[in-house]
């Protein structure tokens, strides 16, 4: 689903020469990872801002800018205000959101839905994980389109990403062993780990 989603929004994104990622809270940290992976795979400079700061520093945004707004709810007011500022300056806006039809999604040129479902816990683990997946897929696709990554690299990375669910299942099967190990390590005052 992510691969189809990124292709649907991809062609217009690849002609930009500057990228801004703007978000708040946990989504901001997904944006920081996005910066690293986009710069590495696409070779385009990326800036990441906390949404509340973006509007007040008069950022260099124009029609050659891709503005990525990341928001779990799609209703984060600071992110929405930053998105409006970027659009006013001519940027192409891509939102990475979880909630279909949210304000951020409606006001964006393109939307990449995370499909994380509702977040029950305070820790935004599902949303963060799916936002990271979106950032990786976006970077891979843009890198492929710009010729910065090869088709073999792209296909291999996609294969690895698709393996994540089975790797997680293997990990969770080891939960009893991990719990036992944690009980052993819990009272130690010092642990030395070497290769």
What do these predicted ranges mean?
Residues 165-167, 171:
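Active-site/ligand-binding-proximal alpha/beta "capping" segment
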Residues 18-163, 195:
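Glycine-rich phosphate-binding loops that contact phosphosugars or nucleotide phosphates
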Residues 2-3, 56, 180:
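A structural connector/turn signal
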Residues 7-12, 173-184:
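A short, well-structured juxtamembrane/interface segment
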Residues 1-10, 15, 192-195:
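Single conserved hydrophobic/aromatic residue that forms the stacking wall/gate
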Residues 185-190:
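Long hydrophobic segments that form regular secondary structure
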């Amino acid at each position: 689903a992510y691969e189809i989603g990124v292709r649907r929004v991809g062609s217009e994104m690849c002609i930009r020469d500057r990228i801004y990622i703007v978000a708040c809270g946990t989504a901001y940290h997904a944006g920081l990872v996005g910066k690293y992976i986009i710069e590495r795979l696409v070779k385009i400079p990326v800036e990441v801002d906390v949404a509340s700061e973006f509007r007040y520093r008069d950022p260099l945004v124009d029609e050659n800018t891709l503005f990525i707004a990341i928001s779990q709810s799609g209703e984060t007011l600071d992110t929405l205000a930053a998105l409006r500022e970027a659009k006013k300056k001519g940027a192409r806006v891509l939102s990475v959101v979880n909630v279909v039809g949210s304000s951020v999604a409606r006001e964006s040129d393109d939307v990449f839905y995370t499909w994380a479902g509702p977040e029950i816990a305070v820790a935004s683990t599902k949303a963060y994980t799916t936002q990271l997946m979106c950032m990786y897929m976006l970077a891979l696709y843009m890198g492929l389109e710009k010729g910065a990554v090869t088709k073999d690299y792209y296909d291999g990375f996609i294969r690895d990403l698709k393996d994540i669910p089975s790797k997680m299942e293997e990990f969770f099967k080891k939960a009893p062993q991990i719990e036992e190990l944690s009980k052993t390590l819990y009272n130690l005052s010092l642990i030395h780990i070497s290769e």
